Amino acid sequence: MDLNTRKILSLFASILFTIPVYIILHEGGHALIALSCGARITEFSILGAYMRYEGGTFTALTLSLFYIAGMLLPVLISIAYMLLYRDAAQSVFYRIFSFLFPLILTAPALAWGIVPLLYLSDQAPPGDDVTGFIESSGASPWAVLLGAVLLFAGCLFL
């Protein structure tokens, strides 16, 4: 198989693997906090990209953690992956996957930079994780925007 074909197949395989992994980590982040608050997970859908829970006792802090955990768990896993990256590896798949995996896992953090701006103009999507975080934590949308920019920039330079 020639190099270009291997690159294309590696690209598609990486995307097909990484997107479901991102969904599992994102929804898993929410689920971990819900479970730690005594909730019971009633649904966890990879294809629908959602999780549902019943019960649990949430404070303002744990509710804020619930909303941000969907973004933070994939970012933390991505950072760990980047730190463990083996530069000497020659596999085409490994190199393409190692480029896409952190990119796909951290790119949704950009929403944490966009939604605060929408929130400031009263156009934030209801039910969104960022909107829920701002409302439950009482954090300034500007602080959330700054945090998202710093986090994303830090991941780019890691």
Predicted features along the sequence, with ranges:
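Short, Lys/Arg-rich, polar N-terminal cytosolic tail immediately upstream
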Residues: 1-5
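Metalloprotease/metallohydrolase-associated module, dominated by Zn2+-dependent proteases
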Residues: 44, 52-158
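Small-residue-rich helix-interface/hinge motifs
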Residues: 7, 14-64
